[in-house]
């Protein structure tokens, strides 16, 4: 016999899954360093500026490698991946005699 789930249990389960998925995206970036305040000691300010520089370098670092342009992505979605046509040689198709 089939068990009928109550609508609120399904909604609660989906909500918990969404919150867990969003939690993984939050951990993707490092936390921003906290400002020590206006009356902080010079050592604390130097430590803060070092941490801030490291934070900025992490979130703005250059990523190397081939980038797809939006036109390439749209063409691939519309027309499919045509890499097999580019890689094939004309001698791959042998004629049947």
From Swiss-Prot:
Gene Ontology cellular-component annotations: extracellular space
Tissue and organ expression note: Mainly expressed in brainstem neurons, and in the telencephalon. Also expressed in intestinal endocrine cells.
Propeptide: 68-97
One Gene Ontology biological process: feeding behavior
Tyrosine amide: residues carrying this PTM: 64
Compartments (UniProt record): Secreted
Family: Belongs to the NPY family.
Name of the protein in question: Peptide YY-A
Species for this entry: Danio rerio (Zebrafish)
Taxonomic lineage of the native organism: Eukaryota, Metazoa, Chordata, Craniata, Vertebrata
Gene assigned in the entry: pyya
């Amino acid at each position: 016999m089939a068990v009928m789930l109550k609508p609120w249990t399904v909604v609660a389960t989906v909500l918990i899954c969404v919150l867990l998925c969003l939690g993984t995206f939050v951990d993707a970036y490092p936390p921003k360093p906290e400002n020590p305040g206006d009356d902080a000691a010079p050592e604390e300010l130097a430590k803060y500026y070092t941490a801030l520089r490291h934070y900025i370098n992490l979130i703005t670092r250059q990523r190397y490698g081939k980038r797809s342009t939006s036109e390439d992505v749209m063409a691939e979605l519309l027309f499919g991946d045509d890499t097999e046509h580019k890689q094939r040689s004309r001698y791959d198709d042998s004629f049947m005699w």
